[in-house]
From Swiss-Prot:
Signal peptide range: 1-17
Tissues expressing this chain: Not expressed in normal tissues except in testis. Expressed in melanoma, bladder and lung carcinomas.
Protein name (Swiss-Prot/TrEMBL): B melanoma antigen 5
Predominant location category: secreted
Function per UniProt: Unknown. Candidate gene encoding tumor antigens.
Entry's family note: Belongs to the BAGE family.
Keywords: Secreted, Signal
Domain of life of the source: Eukaryota
Keyword flag Secreted: yes
Note: The ancestral BAGE gene was generated by juxtacentromeric reshuffling of the KMT2C/MLL3 gene. The BAGE family was expanded by juxtacentromeric movement and/or acrocentric exchanges. BAGE family is composed of expressed genes that map to the juxtacentromeric regions of chromosomes 13 and 21 and of unexpressed gene fragments that scattered in the juxtacentromeric regions of several chromosomes, including chromosomes 9, 13, 18 and 21.
Amino acid sequence: MAAGAVFLALSAQLLQARLMKEESPVVSWRLEPEDGTALCFIF
């Protein structure tokens, strides 16, 4: 379970890096949760 969480966190960072260049700041902000809970909703 922990490995899956780490994988999702890394995927979120990669998506964030792409979206910050291509999409609106709002979308990028949604992929940058301070406590990591938003990952459940994104994936």
